[in-house]
Amino acid sequence: MKKAFVVFLFVLFLSVPAAFPQAGPVEGGHELQVWTGGGHGLSGSQSGDGVWNVGLRYGLILTAPHGPGFLHGRLEYAVDVVPVFLVVQKTNTAYGVGVNPFGFKWALDTRRSVVPYFEIGGGTLFTNTKVPEGTSRINFTSSGALGLHFLRSKYNISTEVRYMHISNAGLATPNPGINTIQFRLGFGLFSQKE
């Protein structure tokens, strides 16, 4: 499975130079995206847990390109609504919804059809059963991601690797949290400033 995923990403990266780029993110423009992602818990007591989620993103490009050298880029503020968030645990599967109102993305200004970015964010997660088991149905999420936008003529495809921590922040005892590594795929567009 791992090898197939690596081959898929390699082929995707090879196809990028042939893509006709759309206009990328610009100051005052917007990002609209639908995405899905999933992964597993990292080492520790919750390492057997798996997650899968689907979300919608609205982003606002806040700045024109600035910054030194290879970090020259734009800042984006983003909000994700997550209508599907599954946590597969040892004894059950938790079904949840979330909202991530704190997303900050730095998209590098490459002037090419591939736009690397990194991102941090946070939000809430509400589930029908306790996550992790025996803790709380209300949790908070914090995350960091590294990704690539592949700009096409009208739309873009995004791929990223995301670290996410899920925790009740002390609302219940115990508070073991779940640390996950996820792979995310998005389909969206950047609207231009009018």
Residue ranges of predicted features:
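Short glycine/proline- and aromatic-enriched beta-strand/turn motifs that initiate or cap beta-hairpins
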Residues: 20-63, 175, 180-194
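Cleavable N-terminal export/targeting peptides
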Residues: 1-26, 192-194
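Transmembrane beta-strand segments that form the barrel wall of outer-membrane beta-barrel proteins
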Residues: 32-42, 78-85, 120-126, 160-165
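Residues that define the transmembrane beta-barrel architecture of outer-membrane proteins
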Residues: 28-30, 48-54, 93-100, 114, ...
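Short loop/turn motifs that connect adjacent beta-strands in outer-membrane beta-barrel proteins
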Residues: 20-29, 63-75, 109-115, 151-157, ...
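Residues on the lipid-exposed face of transmembrane beta-strands in outer-membrane beta-barrel proteins
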Residues: 34, 38, 54-60, 102-108, ...
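Gram-negative (and chloroplast) outer-membrane scaffold detector with strong preference
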Residues: 54-128
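Extracellular loop and loop/strand-boundary signature of outer-membrane beta-barrel proteins
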Residues: 42-44, 89-91, 128-134, 169-175
